[in-house]
């Protein structure tokens, strides 16, 4: 490789920053996402999810059902530039039923932003996703939102993060008042008070005024009580000691904390600028040949998401690929690790929710969209040059099950196509009965909303009305010993044997008690709550 290309790749990687936002539903994730895009210049007016009909719908919530319900139910990728940085924002589903889609997205992220509602503090979904981030060793940034509403005490919120998550905190900025007395934030990095004016309900960039702490002008903007309260709280923070150690941040041991109000733009720009300064740039990833650095000259990447019908006019399928190493170029030919085939990547796209534009090149840390004619699966590795495979993305145990029935035989082809494409993109897990007379697919999900989404999309995207027939099971376990172990075990009571989409045996149980009984009686089965997918499949 020429030294010019090496330098080009090195410089490109240094400019890349990518992150995913994790939160409990209704913490304001979609709003924060849009405000970051607003400050990044990617959009000029933010459309709040719960906005009136005459306002724009949220940019990141592009699927029809998302627009109707005002929730994020599929992950999207939003790319924009800010101050010479190329930012990939991996927007994730906020609803708890879609935690598996969030997990897949976190596999492609280098950093995570933990969004917390200032009135509620840590909530169950946030805790669950935090553990996933910790498992992956991601640096975690914290944005405490909705300071313009009644809140808990800021110091109490910091203490909760430290005590419950075992994560040290460092307040990068500090709120001045809360609720209707919220006046702005104090930036500890530059020792200045930032005062904001609300404008067009936060749909445009906020006008902000920065004043040094000892400036006499402060009296014109802050009540004396708030000013003295701020000084007192800053002294407490100082006494608590500690600085923001970037190594500790990158190792996932400390979280920088930012306060603000995404809806009214308070603190959003301060967060974005500090994030770009502190965040981890793309790093090396584990593979079958060891850790591979993003500046490695040969291109490689992995598929972390598939999406059907992003453009309803063309009924397309797109594979979301995280570029890991080297330089991606349009029309390049790559190897597909799972099948050994070569694939020409002729129509690469830059993604922005459902909007796309053609690209000529991409580097480590970028996310690109590739046309998927049924070749790619979640977890697949593509590469040029030396063969390698990245770690697979696990598939988690579903908790509710139902037969999906097609009452209209004339829609058989559309029904089969819809099931195949929704299964491929990971919208739902599909299983089948081992009884050849029962041909209906079994939907396996972590929550009821996933069933509703599948039925909605089958109708709106494939024109097929469907019926659900619930099954009385709540626990699924893959049989790691395979069909041979299952046959040797003989009859297994209080369970249903099904096969997943790769014909691997799965046992369904009505409850944990039945599961534990089988585990005790037949340990040779090797029951597992997760199964690898994509390149990690044990076929």
UniProtKB/Swiss-Prot annotation:
<dbReference type="Pfam" id="PF16658">
    <property type="entry name" value="RF3_C"/>
</dbReference>
<feature type="binding site">
    <location>
        <begin position="23"/>
        <end position="30"/>
    </location>
    <ligand>
        <name>GTP</name>
    </ligand>
</feature>
<dbReference type="GO" id="GO:0016149">
    <property type="term" value="F:translation release factor activity, codon specific"/>
</dbReference>
<dbReference type="InterPro" id="IPR004548">
    <property type="entry name" value="PrfC"/>
</dbReference>
<dbReference type="GO" id="GO:0005525">
    <property type="term" value="F:GTP binding"/>
</dbReference>
<keyword id="KW-0547">Nucleotide-binding</keyword>
<dbReference type="InterPro" id="IPR027417">
    <property type="entry name" value="P-loop_NTPase"/>
</dbReference>
<dbReference type="Pfam" id="PF00009">
    <property type="entry name" value="GTP_EFTU"/>
</dbReference>
<dbReference type="GO" id="GO:0003924">
    <property type="term" value="F:GTPase activity"/>
</dbReference>
<dbReference type="GO" id="GO:0005829">
    <property type="term" value="C:cytosol"/>
</dbReference>
<comment type="similarity">
    <text>Belongs to the TRAFAC class translation factor GTPase superfamily. Classic translation factor GTPase family. PrfC subfamily.</text>
</comment>
<dbReference type="GO" id="GO:0006449">
    <property type="term" value="P:regulation of translational termination"/>
</dbReference>
<feature type="binding site">
    <location>
        <begin position="91"/>
        <end position="95"/>
    </location>
    <ligand>
        <name>GTP</name>
    </ligand>
</feature>
<dbReference type="InterPro" id="IPR009000">
    <property type="entry name" value="Transl_B-barrel_sf"/>
</dbReference>
<dbReference type="InterPro" id="IPR000795">
    <property type="entry name" value="T_Tr_GTP-bd_dom"/>
</dbReference>
<feature type="domain" description="tr-type G">
    <location>
        <begin position="14"/>
        <end position="283"/>
    </location>
</feature>
<dbReference type="InterPro" id="IPR032090">
    <property type="entry name" value="RF3_C"/>
</dbReference>
<dbReference type="InterPro" id="IPR005225">
    <property type="entry name" value="Small_GTP-bd"/>
</dbReference>
<dbReference type="InterPro" id="IPR041732">
    <property type="entry name" value="RF3_GTP-bd"/>
</dbReference>
<feature type="binding site">
    <location>
        <begin position="145"/>
        <end position="148"/>
    </location>
    <ligand>
        <name>GTP</name>
    </ligand>
</feature>
<keyword id="KW-0342">GTP-binding</keyword>
<dbReference type="InterPro" id="IPR038467">
    <property type="entry name" value="RF3_dom_3_sf"/>
</dbReference>
<dbReference type="Pfam" id="PF22042">
    <property type="entry name" value="EF-G_D2"/>
</dbReference>
<protein>
    <recommendedName>
        <fullName>Peptide chain release factor 3</fullName>
    </recommendedName>
</protein>
<dbReference type="InterPro" id="IPR053905">
    <property type="entry name" value="EF-G-like_DII"/>
</dbReference>
<comment type="function">
    <text>Increases the formation of ribosomal termination complexes and stimulates activities of RF-1 and RF-2. It binds guanine nucleotides and has strong preference for UGA stop codons. It may interact directly with the ribosome. The stimulation of RF-1 and RF-2 is significantly reduced by GTP and GDP, but not by GMP.</text>
</comment>
<dbReference type="InterPro" id="IPR035647">
    <property type="entry name" value="EFG_III/V"/>
</dbReference>
<dbReference type="InterPro" id="IPR031157">
    <property type="entry name" value="G_TR_CS"/>
</dbReference>
<keyword id="KW-0648">Protein biosynthesis</keyword>
<keyword id="KW-0963">Cytoplasm</keyword>
<dbReference type="GO" id="GO:0016150">
    <property type="term" value="F:translation release factor activity, codon nonspecific"/>
</dbReference>
């Amino acid at each position: 490789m020429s030294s010019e290309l090496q330098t080009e790749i090195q410089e490109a990687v240094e400019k890349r920053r990518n992150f995913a936002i994790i939160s409990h539903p209704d913490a304001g994730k979609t709003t924060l996402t849009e405000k970051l895009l607003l400050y990044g210049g990617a959009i000029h007016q933010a459309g709040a999810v719960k906005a009136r009909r005459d306002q724009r719908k949220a940019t990141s919530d592009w699927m029809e059902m998302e627009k109707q319900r005002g929730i994020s139910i599929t992950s999207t990728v939003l790319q924009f530039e800010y101050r010479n940085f190329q930012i990939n924002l991996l927007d994730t589903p906020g609803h708890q039923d879609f935690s598996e889609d969030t997990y897949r997205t976190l596999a492609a992220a280098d950093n995570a932003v933990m969004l917390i509602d200032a009135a509620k503090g840590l909530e169950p979904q946030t805790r669950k996703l935090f553990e996933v981030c910790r498992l992956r060793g991601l640096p975690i940034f914290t944005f405490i939102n909705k300071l313009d509403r009644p809140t808990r005490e800021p110091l109490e919120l910091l203490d909760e993060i430290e005590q419950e998550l075992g994560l040290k905190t460092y307040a990068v900025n500090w709120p001045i008042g809360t609720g209707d007395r919220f006046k702005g934030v104090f930036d500890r990095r530059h020792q200045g008070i930032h005062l904001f004016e609300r404008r067009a309900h936060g749909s445009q960039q906020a006008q902000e005024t920065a004043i040094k702490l000892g400036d006499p002008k402060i009296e014109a903007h802050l009540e004396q009580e708030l000013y003295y309260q701020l000084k007192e709280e800053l002294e407490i923070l100082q006494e608590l000691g500690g600085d923001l150690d970037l190594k500790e941040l990158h190792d996932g041991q400390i979280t920088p904390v930012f306060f603000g109000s995404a809806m009214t733009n308070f603190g959003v720009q301060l967060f974005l600028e500090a994030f770009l300064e502190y965040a981890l740039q793309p790093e090396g990833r584990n593979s079958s040949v060891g850790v591979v650095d993003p500046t490695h000259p040969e291109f490689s990447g992995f598929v972390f998401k598939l999406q059907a019908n992003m453009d309803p006019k063309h009924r397309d399928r797109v594979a979301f690929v995280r570029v890991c190493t080297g330089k991606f170029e349009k029309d390049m030919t790559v190897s597909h690790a799972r099948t050994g085939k070569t694939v020409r990547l002729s129509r690469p796209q830059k993604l922005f929710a459902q909007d796309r534009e053609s690209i000529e090149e991409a580097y480590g840390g970028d996310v690109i969209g590739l046309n998927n004619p049924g070749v790619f699966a979640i977890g697949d590795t593509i590469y040029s040059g030396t063969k390698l495979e990245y770690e697979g993305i696990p598939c988690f145990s579903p908790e509710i099950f139902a037969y999906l029935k097609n009452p209209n035989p004339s829609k058989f082809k559309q029904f089969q196509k819809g099931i195949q494409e929704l299964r491929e993109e990971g919208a739902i897990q599909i299983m089948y009965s081992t009884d050849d007379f029962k041909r209906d697919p079994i939907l396996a999900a972590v929550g009821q909303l996933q069933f509703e989404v599948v039925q909605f999309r089958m109708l709106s995207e494939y024109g097929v009305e469907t019926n659900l027939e619930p099954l009385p099971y709540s626990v699924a376990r893959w049989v790691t010993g395979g069909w041979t172990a299952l046959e040797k075990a003989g009859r297994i009571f209080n369970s249903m044997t099904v096969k997943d989409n790769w014909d691997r045996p799965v046992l369904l149980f009505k409850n944990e008690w039945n599961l534990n009984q089988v585990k005790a009686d037949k340990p040779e089965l090797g029951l597992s709550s997760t199964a690898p997918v994509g390149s990690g499949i044990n076929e």
